Each structure stands twice: as C-alpha cells, then as structure tokens.
Design a protein with these regions (language model features):
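Surface-exposed binding/hinge segments that line
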Residues: 107, 143-194, 219
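Structural transition elements
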Residues: 333-370, 387-393
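Long beta-strand-rich cores associated with HINT superfamily self-processing modules
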Residues: 512-535
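N-terminal lobe/hinge region of extracytoplasmic solute-binding protein
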Residues: 37-99, 210-212
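Ligand-site clamp/hinge motif
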Residues: 109, 203, 232-278, 400, ...
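Gly/Pro-rich hinge or "lid" segments in bacterial periplasmic/extracellular proteins
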Residues: 69-82, 86, 180-240, 244, ...
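Extracytoplasmic/peripheral linker and loop segments enriched in polar/acidic and small residues
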Residues: 337, 355-358, 404-419, 424, ...
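Aromatic- and charge-enriched surface segment that lines or borders ligand/interaction sites
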Residues: 93-138, 157, 163-168, 256-259, ...
Length: 535
C-alpha cells in the first residue's frame, strides 16, 4: 500500500476527523509542533490502572508531577541519559532526610497548580500515595520494591509540607519516589468520580487525565492517536519549548519509516532493528542508540505447568534456542548477546550477564530424554504484537528450532494493548518477552522477576524460597563482599533452574529529524517531550 493511501485509509477507517500527518507537517512547520509516529500507543491515561502498558508510562511522565526527578549524565556514545544517583526537585522544591535516615520531609512548591487551576497541596500528595500502595498490582508492587508500602507512612504536616516515614533503611526508597508511579493526582477532581466498587476512581482516570504536569491531554483516541498540549502554568521545571505533540499510532513499520524520511514525522522510537541500522547508515535522519540498562529479551516458561515444571525440559529449551540466528535475523545485531558464557555461574554483580547455554541440539535432545519427554509435546508460544518487529521473526526461529527436539509450537500473537493483562493471568505456557528494571540493581530485577511474591513480571510463576533469601539479603546488604555473594546466589540459581532463558540485552533506538535536539534516554523507555526542541 502506498503511504498516501495508507494515511487516507486509516483516517477513513477510524471514522474521525484526524488530520493526516502529511497535512500536519506541511501546514505547520513551526517549532512548537512535534509529530510522533509509534507502533503502539497508551491503553490507559493512568499508570495505576490494571494492565497499563509501557506507552502509558509516557502519559504519566509528562502529564503528572512527582516530588522528585532524576538528574542527567552523558551515556554510551555521548547520548544524554538519566542519572539514577542524582535526584533533583520537581513538585518538591526541597527535601530533608532525617539524621537517622528513617524519614524525609518534602517542601512543596506553593505556586504549583493542577490543569484545572486548583492548587497542589500535601493533601493531594497524601491521597495519591495512599492510592498507589492500595490499588494492588503493578503500582503497589513497584513501590514495595523501595519499601514504600503503607498509607501510614505518609503524613501531611501542613498544606505544603509532606513527610514519608520509612519502615526500614532501603537504598531504593528515595529513587523509587522518582519513578513514574508516585505521581500526584488532583484528588478532589478524581473523588468526584469514585464509586463503592471503585474507591480510587480508576475507571475514570483510565480515560481522563487529572494531573498538573508540563503537558495535558488535549484528546485521546485509543488505538489511533493521543494529542498533548503544553500547560503554560507549569511551575515544576523549565517550560518546554514544544507546545503541542501529535502522537499517532501507525502499525506499519514501513509507513513509519517512509513518513520519517520524507519529513512528515519528527520522531519514532518503535522500528525494526533492520530499519534503524539502515537509517543510521543512510544519514537522512539521526539515530540515537543506548543499551537498555537492567533489561533482557527472554524466553519464559510457566513452571507451574507440565512439562515446563521439569528443570531438565527448561534446560533443553535453553540449548535448543537458535541464539545467533535471532541476533542476526530478528535483532540485526542491535543488542548485546547473553548466551555462550564461560559457564552457568555469576561473574561479578553486573546484570544482565551471559549464561553458559548455547545452541546444542544433541544436548537438548538428551535432556528431553532424561526428562521423560523424548517424543516431545505440543505447546503455545506467545508474544506481544506491540513488539512484533523483533518478536515475530524471533518466535518463528524459536518454533522451528524447538521442533527439532519434538516441541511443536503454535504461535500466538497477543495485541499490544492486551499483553499486560494477559501476563497477569499467568496462564501462557511459553512466551517471548522483554523486561527492564527501572532501578539499575540486579536485586531489583530479581525482586520483580523471580521472587515468590509472584509479581506481574514473574511471568514464569517461579517460586524458590532459597532464591528469595538471596534477593532479600542483597536488597539491604551494605557489605560489598556479602552483597556479591548474595547476587551470585540468585544469579546461579536462575541460570541452573532457567525458568527464563536470557537471549540478549536490547538497545533503545530512536530515530528523529536532524533539527530535533534535547533527546534523553530514560529508564521507562519513553521520550521526555519536555526536553525536546526544534533547532
């Protein structure tokens, strides 16, 4: 399909008055308009709602304020990136940690207002924090990772003074207050929409924004487009240069690339690795690449379901994965290999790090025989269609290879908007997925992905009390030698029992016009439009 035909057909199919990107670009070349093309957009305007996807994190980041944010530094290749060791003011203009380290007092900006003009007070912060530790699921578990767990920890001192009491000394607590989840809601506005069954107003905030951040949602057509408008009365940082953002969902990678190279789109960050490789070599646009910290592509097996409850079957799968083919044909070498290490032991405290599995069909067949399933079995291999540019070709290669050891896979494509909800069900036997921990510590990754509390991202439903002890010890250990021993303990178990098989550490690639300046790599993998400007 031709690009112009595609644009016309999407507008007609939507049955809306969405302006074609081509017309937007040609009619408004002003510096304050940014046009973005994505494969998948937000499925919710509220990060606290069940199943909110990664693009929803971007809504939270720019439409809501947090008490603090992270500083910046130069990363690999000179790309500007966040600095998790440096906290800076956002809604809070200052803070003071108690001498005993068991509480922190925040002083709020007295001139901050929500998008409807209502003042932001400590009561709003208290209500928002109570909400995030009470709604359950992802937001509650995220804050628990930093020992932020109970409403009783949050205290309104006065209208513009707020205190957080810590239940234990945890190096992640302050950092956890600067991730997307602890955002501040207009509590009085949301309270107008609560019900007995929905005491936190989640149904309303899923489709309605209630923040006071640098941008407000001007319009949202789920599955099609979200439009942001700058909030000119924002006081929690430097007012952004970009006044309006049109973020359009265009499923076809070919169309996104064509629109970008023609100049109809300013930026895209969801493209096949092959396209990023070609565009970086072509020189028409700028491609910025950063290895994603604390992140892996992996094959996960549900250990509660036979035959994946047998470690030997899981090890057989680990030896049957065609790692090199996936790296070459699905990832186009735009990732870091995590297979073929010296052995299945931890080497240092870095994460991710390579395991000792490599492509070895005879060894995989021998393990299948030892497991009592020499004749193989049938299963379903599922992936997120929202990351299909990598996942689909990788799944085809994995299925072809597993067939060599008798495992016949039916490939299931799950729409991106439904993927998180599907993960929550914990009923998919075999998946290809990508996960990255927001806070760059191995114990944080393992707390999310391997701990027996069985968080949403423990997609394998793996539970091992012995590993839990190592994870918990590492979270609070201050002695470096003991910390290294704890990390080695849980990494060694993960490699031996292999409920998930790491494939590669992904890159974050972003392609943009040459006049776009200010891009920053963030751990949540969404562009911070507040930083961008057109030169």
């Amino acid at each position: 399909m031709k690009r112009r035909d595609f644009i016309t057909s999407t507008v007609a199919a939507a049955g809306t008055l969405m302006i074609p990107l081509e017309a937007l670009a040609q009619s408004d070349r002003r510096k304050e308009l940014l046009i973005v093309a994505n494969e998948t957009g937000p499925n919710s305007l509220d990060i606290h709602t069940v199943g909110a996807n990664r693009p929803s994190y971007g809504v939270s980041w720019i439409c809501y304020d947090r008490l603090m944010t992270f500083g910046k530094k130069k990363g690999p290749g000179g790309v500007t990136m966040y600095d998790f060791t440096k906290l800076e003011p956002e809604l809070a203009e200052s803070w003071q940690v108690a001498p005993d380290g068991m509480s922190v007092v925040f002083k709020l900006r007295k001139n901050a207002k929500f998008h409807d003009g209502a003042p932001v007070t400590a009561k709003d912060v208290k209500w928002s924090f109570d909400r995030m530790v009470s709604v359950g699921g992802f937001p509650t578990f995220q804050m628990k990772a930093g020992s932020i767990e109970k409403p009783e920890q949050f205290v309104v001192v006065d209208d513009y003074t707020f205190r957080v009491n810590f239940i234990r000394k945890d190096k992640l607590s302050m950092m956890d207050l600067a991730v997307p989840v602890p955002c501040v809601y207009n509590s009085e506005l949301v309270k107008k929409h609560v019900t007995e069954k929905d005491p936190w107003g989640l149904d309303w905030t899923k489709a309605n924004e209630a923040g006071g951040g640098a941008y407000k949602v001007e319009s949202w057509k789920p599955g099609q487009e979200i439009v942001y408008a700058r909030y000119d009365d924002w006081k929690s940082g430097k007012l952004p240069k970009i006044k309006r953002i049109v973020q359009r969902e265009i499923p076809s990678a070919g169309n996104r690339r064509a629109l970008l190279e023609k100049g109809d789109v300013d930026i895209t960050y969801e493209m096949p690795p092959k396209d990023f490789l070609e565009m970086s070599e072509g020189g028409k646009v700028v491609v910025q690449t950063t290895p994603i910290e604390n992140a892996i592509w992996y094959v996960g097996m549900n250990v509660t379901r036979p035959p994946f409850n047998n470690p030997k079957v899981r090890q057989a799968v680990a030896y049957a994965i065609p790692y090199e083919k996936i790296m070459d044909s699905a990832m186009y070498k735009r990732a870091t290999r995590l297979w073929g290490g010296k052995d299945n032991k931890a080497h240092g405290t870095d994460w991710p790090q390579p395991h000792g599995y490599a492509y070895d069909i005879p060894k995989a067949r021998a393990l299948m025989k030892e497991a009592g399933v020499a004749d193989g079995f049938e299963t379903t291999l599922s992936f997120d269609l929202g990351s299909g540019t990598v996942s689909e070709p990788a799944c085809v290669l994995i299925a072809e290879s597993l067939a060599l050891i008798g495992i016949k896979c039916r490939i299931e494509k799950v729409p991106g908007a439904n993927w998180r909800a599907q993960l929550l069900k914990k009923d998919m036997p075999l998946i290809l997925n990508r996960f990255g921990g927001w806070l760059n510590y191995p114990e944080y990754f393992f707390f999310w992905c391997y701990h027996s509390q069985d968080a949403v991202f423990n997609t394998m439903s793996y539970k091992n009390p012995a590993m839990d002890k190592f994870i918990e010890a590492a979270r609070f250990e201050s002695d470096r030698k003991k910390y290294a021993e704890d990390v080695a303990g849980f990494v060694n178990m993960a490699f031996d029992e292999v409920p998930r098989v790491p494939l590669a550490q992904p890159n974050m690639d972003v392609a943009m016009q040459k006049n776009i300046k200010g891009y920053t790599y963030w751990f949540h993998l969404q562009p911070d439009y507040r930083d961008l400007e057109k030169a």
